[in-house]
Amino acid sequence: MSFRVKGWSDQFSESFYERATTLLTAALNKGTKHSMIADHITVKELDLGPQPPQLEILEVGDLAPDRFQGLFNLHYSGDASLVLQTKIRANPLSVQKSNVPSFSSRNTMLASRAPLTVPMFLRLSDLKLNGIVVLVFSKQKGITVVFRNDPLESVRVSSSFDSIPAIARFLQREIEVQLVSLFQEELPSIIYKMSRIWFAKSDSNLSFQKIPFTSPNQSHTSLANYNPDLLDGPPDYHESTKVDTHLPIKMGPLDVQTHPNIRSIASLALSRKALLPISSPSIPMSIYRSTPPDTIIQQLTTQSDDISAVSSPATQYSASDYLGSNDTTARPSIFGRSHGTSQFRRRERVKKRHVIKIHEASNKSASSSETFVGSKNVDLTESAFDSIPDTPTKIITNINKLKRNYTITNNWLENLQQKIPSEVDNGKVSGLQYSAFKLLMLQRLMAAKGSF
């Protein structure tokens, strides 16, 4: 969708051209200039012409009575013109003396042996633009125009040195580079400042609030210390009306010690010390954001040593005791929520595994100190059938062989013989597992003997 702008030439008054000329002059003299330019650049004439630009609406982001945000496609091929005046330094060439007699040549100055400052007029016309423009309008903040790409297609440059082709080509190239920088950097600032002036003049009831601040070292502000450059009014309004040829965008003085924003930032930086481990309670296995890296490594190493020292040698703990399926740590951490860990997660129950290791007796005569190695925390009242594996690795068929190789008293064998019939009568032991059952009962008795 596109629209036309009616009354383009009637919208700009003489005061507008004066203000635009002043701001454009300050923008052209900003920064470093070329070494050939010997004086300030002055805008002598500015004419936007009767032909308006063409705008095509691509997107409308926000629309309200006091604000607007949209994306436009800008096309302009009008008769706007700009005339500049400055002084340049000519590069004189030292021409060698010719052997031609003087009567055969004209008495004209061919070159200069010293630098010359020559005035120059520069005229820009036949401007053609085509680009994407982001327009943001706010009645309280002004108008912001930003070009997403390079809008310049072509421009005609005419100067006082058009008779010299080398200088004409050089000026054409340099002016195009400067116009690209003007459209992308300086023009948005000029439009913003002028929009603040328009809104301040059209509506004097705009509420621009200023935050009152009293210096801690000074209870009141005297007239002697009052800065006339900082007047009460809309933000940037009075600053925009003052023009500095060296610095067009002027900012007011900022007191680092007493400015409220600087003090707020300093207070926020000091409040970060509350997160240090020195002033906050220490949580095991937690990594603090303000903790140095060497402290983190030392803290984790100490805690891992404490955990390994507490575990019993007769009990093995699996990895699930410390790490869950979805958790990276088993204790509270500031990164717990990012991994799906709840703040009130219940601590998992420690799982114990009883490990029974049986060593086979050698062919030589075994010593009386050889016993079965197993866990000492074995309950004799537990059913022996529950501890028998489904597929035993080895079946002992001769109990007398165990009696020969190991020192077993008659009292131990009687307890074993009393335990076996009780299990058989209850129907818990099958015929295939009978020998393995006897071996396990003997191992339990030997383990109980070692625990006394």
Swiss-Prot record:
Keywords: Lipid transport, Lipid-binding, Membrane, Mitochondrion, Mitochondrion outer membrane, Transmembrane, Transmembrane beta strand, Transport. It comes from Schizosaccharomyces pombe (strain 972 / ATCC 24843). Component of the ERMES/MDM complex, which serves as a molecular tether to connect the endoplasmic reticulum (ER) and mitochondria. Components of this complex are involved in the control of mitochondrial shape and protein biogenesis, and function in nonvesicular lipid trafficking between the ER and mitochondria. Mdm34 is required for the interaction of the ER-resident membrane protein mmm1 and the outer mitochondrial membrane-resident beta-barrel protein mdm10. Coiled coil: none annotated. Component of the ER-mitochondria encounter structure (ERMES) or MDM complex, composed of mmm1, mdm10, mdm12 and mdm34. Belongs to the MDM34 family. This is Mitochondrial distribution and morphology protein 34. The lineage of its organism: Eukaryota, Fungi, Dikarya, Ascomycota, Taphrinomycotina. One of its GO terms (cellular component) is mitochondrion. Lacks alpha-helical transmembrane segments, suggesting that it resides in the membrane via beta-sheet conformations similar to those predicted for other outer membrane proteins and porin.
